[in-house]
Amino acid sequence: MPIEIPTDLTPELVPLSWLIGEWEGRGRLGSGDEDSEHFVQRVSFTHNGLPYLQYRAETWLSDDAGEKLRPLTVETGFWALERKLEEGDGGPGLIPADIVPVLKTADEVEERRNKEGGFDISVSIAHPGGITELYYGQIKGPQIQLSTDMVMRGSHSKEYTAATRIFGLVDGNLLWRWDVAASGKALEAHASAFLHKVS
């Protein structure tokens, strides 16, 4: 499946452009063994002309045939190249960015490539229950690796201390795995899924 890059995409999102669109599919909780519960998921990555992707994932528990049983959770966030913000960038709050993006050309984006040949990225994801994750990691072609730098929890949130996520594009499909450290345990398999692009 060819990757189409939107003509209005800001240059620094080109490394992330293969994520843009809506994805649907099925997954398993835990390690994915025969006792692991099933889920279905719909994920969207959208852009609005600013230098980040907006992310939303909605997940339902399902039977083993993929029929939805009940809502499981929703998470939402932002994905961007990790770089020092400059005067032309927007924020904080409603302070507008310059109309011309800070990184204006493909060459300026290429200069941000790291020693491993990929690009450093940051991802923030908010969850119900007062939990927000801040991930740092790398995108290298169709592969993404993320590790939490910080997990912020509300005063009544369940214990959750760290996570890693990996994403990959394989034969036009989005595969991901999420490991978490929660409830006093070390990092362990939390969920994984296989999603196909629907738009």
Swiss-Prot record:
The keyword Iron applies. Its EC number is 5.99.-.-. This is Peroxynitrite isomerase. Pfam families: THAP4_heme-bd. It comes from Paenarthrobacter aurescens (strain TC1). Gene3D superfamilies: 2.40.128.20. Its cofactor is heme b. Keywords: Heme, Iron, Isomerase, Metal-binding. Pathway: Nitrogen metabolism. A motif (GXWXGXG) lies at residues 21-27. Heme b binds at H190. Binds 1 heme b group per subunit, that coordinates a highly solvent-exposed Fe(III) atom. Forms a 10-stranded antiparallel beta-barrel structure able to accommodate a hydrophobic ligand in its interior. In fact, this fold hosts the heme group, which is located in a wide surface cleft. Homodimer. It catalyses: peroxynitrite = nitrate. It comes from the Bacteria. Belongs to the nitrobindin family. PANTHER family: PEROXYNITRITE ISOMERASE THAP4 (PTHR15854:SF4), THAP4 PROTEIN (PTHR15854). GO terms for molecular function: heme binding; metal ion binding; peroxynitrite isomerase activity. Transmembrane segments: none annotated. Heme-binding protein able to scavenge peroxynitrite and to protect free L-tyrosine against peroxynitrite-mediated nitration, by acting as a peroxynitrite isomerase that converts peroxynitrite to nitrate. Therefore, this protein likely plays a role in peroxynitrite sensing and in the detoxification of reactive nitrogen and oxygen species (RNS and ROS, respectively). Is able to bind nitric oxide (NO) in vitro, but may act as a sensor of peroxynitrite levels in vivo.
